């Protein structure tokens, strides 16, 4: 049989024709599928825009709230429960619903936007125990302005929720995270210090904030340190909280006695503190004591703890690598226990004693709690209080007034009970 006869026989064979047809169809489908994939990749790269936001980014929680507001009709939700316990013991619980992990479609700016929330089950934040997440926005077109508008709107929504409130931050790992609910701003007038003390500190802070160019022109590091010292309960921390409210600043709380705090971590945290915030280091005497004291004079409660060294703290406050545009407040009950190197100018630029209540302070506090009473009654209360006790703290006086909220006469009559 010749070759031409063999080929002719194959053409006449129905089984061979059917098989060849199937191979052809399969090949065509495979080519079409690959072409569709390549075409989709080309289309997504050139005619679609994507924005990915990881959970560690500061805007992540802003965007979750924004998605919740715009994806009102989604039926796939996750809940975030928060509660706050009042001093009376009553617990207020709040449930916040967010779109669950998965795909959601949102109509925004006259276009459809696909929102994909992904939760990584294999990875989690070691400090909070929460899984790592990300949110990806996908939209048609090549205009980035849509995503800028979304981020700006999410930011404004978050700031509106914090408007008129003081946000507290605490150090979690290598970053600052909000601590609890934003608090209502405390009026500066609600903290009564000795005459002229509050004004001196407020004027100094405002002068520092308003003159960054003065520091730059003279080559002076743009940072400011304050030390408030005095007996406990006299209003040091309360004044700092009220000052933050007056300035519209947040507060970053840091404990130097934290065993996980190292030199590098402290330096990093001070460098990445939120803008327009006050860094508060409370009771610095509890972490470090003066090197001039004898070892026998150092109780265990005041020995250095953790991995943070004294030199590391000094370098973080004003070393070569220390950050600028920073306001640091330190408080202590025992200034004599602090090392002179810690409180020298450059690390502490202004030291202020906040002591027991004077006659003027007692008068002002009485008039604030009982505005309907005369100045003579307020003066009489102050004289009686100082005659009974010469070392009254603001916390003790306020606690006494709380027992006689509507009874100023009782507050004066029972002044002897103020320390009981």
From Swiss-Prot:
Residues 33-420 are mitochondrial matrix. Gene3D superfamilies: P-loop containing nucleotide triphosphate hydrolases (3.40.50.300). Its main location: mitochondrion. It is found in: Mitochondrion inner membrane. GO terms for cellular component: mitochondrial inner membrane. Its EC number is 3.6.1.-. GO terms for molecular function: ATP binding; ATP hydrolysis activity. It holds the Pfam family AAA. The keyword Membrane applies. The chain crosses the membrane at residues 16-32. Chaperone necessary for the incorporation of Rieske iron-sulfur protein uqcrfs1 into the mitochondrial respiratory chain complex III. This is Mitochondrial chaperone BCS1. It comes from Danio rerio. The gene is bcs1l.
């Amino acid at each position: 049989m010749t070759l031409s006869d063999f080929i002719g026989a194959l053409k006449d064979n129905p089984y061979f024709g059917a098989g060849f047809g199937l191979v052809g169809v399969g090949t065509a489908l495979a080519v079409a599928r690959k072409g569709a994939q390549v075409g989709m990749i080309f289309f997504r790269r050139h005619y679609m825009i994507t924005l990915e936001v990881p959970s560690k980014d500061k805007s992540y929680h802003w965007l979750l709230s924004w998605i919740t507001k715009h994806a009102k009709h989604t039926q796939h939700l996750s809940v975030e429960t928060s509660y706050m316990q009042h001093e009376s013991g009553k617990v207020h619980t709040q449930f916040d619903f967010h779109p669950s992990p998965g795909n959601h479609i949102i109509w925004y700016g006259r276009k459809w936007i696909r929102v994909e929330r992904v939760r990584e089950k294999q990875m989690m934040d070691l400090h909070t125990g929460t899984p790592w997440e990300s949110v990806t926005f996908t939209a048609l077109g090549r205009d980035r302005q849509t995503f800028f508008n979304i981020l700006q709107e999410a930011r404004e929504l978050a700031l509106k929720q914090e408007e008129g409130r003081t946000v507290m931050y605490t150090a979690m790992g290598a970053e600052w995270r909000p601590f609890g609910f934003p608090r209502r701003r405390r009026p500066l007038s609600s903290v009564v210090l000795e005459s002229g003390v509050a004004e001196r500190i407020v004027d100094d802070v405002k002068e520092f904030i308003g003159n960054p160019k003065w520091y730059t022109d003279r080559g002076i590091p743009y940072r400011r340190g304050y030390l408030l010292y005095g007996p406990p309960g006299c209003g040091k921390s309360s004044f700092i909280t009220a000052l933050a409210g007056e300035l519209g600043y947040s507060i970053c709380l840091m404990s130097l006695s934290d065993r996980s705090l190292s030199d590098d971590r402290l330096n990093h945290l001070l460098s990445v503190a939120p803008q327009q915030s006050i860094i508060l280091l409370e009771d610095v005497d509890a972490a470090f004591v003066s090197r001039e004291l004898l070892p026998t004079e150092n109780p265990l409660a005041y020995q250095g703890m953790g991995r943070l060294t004294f030199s590391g703290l000094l370098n973080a406050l004003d070393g070569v690598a220390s950050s600028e545009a920073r306001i640091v407040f330190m408080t202590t009950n025992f200034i004599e226990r602090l090392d002179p190197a810690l409180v020298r100018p450059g690390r502490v630029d202004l030291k202020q004693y906040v002591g027991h209540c004077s006659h003027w302070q007692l008068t002002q506090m009485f008039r604030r709690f009982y505005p309907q009473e005369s100045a003579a009654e307020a003066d009489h209360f102050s004289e009686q209080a100082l005659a009974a006790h010469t070392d009254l703290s603001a916390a003790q006086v306020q606690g006494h007034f709380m027992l006689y909220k509507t009874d100023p006469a009782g507050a004066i009559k029972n002044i002897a009970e103020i320390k009981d």
